[in-house]
């Protein structure tokens, strides 16, 4: 239960949720993420570090670049479902299974 609470706490931050949305779609390096979220590189790196420690993000090296991605299908589906549920709430579209 504590691990689930920590994961959800990490997603409660708007910047981290946006990063997770991007990383759920595929691998990105820090430069691409900085451009996508419009924040300073150190801030993005700090958020990525927190997401990695929470087990939501994995990183692999490609030469000198670090490539980040959402860690596993469960995490990707969690992010997608949260964003879809929010979209339904905002648009007033009925929920579905």
Predicted regions and their residues:
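N-terminal helix-turn-helix DNA-binding core of bacterial DNA-binding proteins
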Residues: 2-42, 66-74
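Amphipathic alpha-helical dimerization/coiled-coil segments
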Residues: 1-3, 72-97
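Short amphipathic alpha-helical "recognition" segments used for binding
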Residues: 31-33, 50, 54
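Residues within the DNA-recognition helix of helix-turn-helix
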Residues: 47
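Residue-level detector of secondary-structure transition/capping positions
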Residues: 27-28, 52, 83
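Beta-hairpin "wing" of winged helix-turn-helix
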Residues: 52-62, 69
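Juxtamembrane/interface motifs at transmembrane-helix termini
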Residues: 39-42, 54, 88, 97
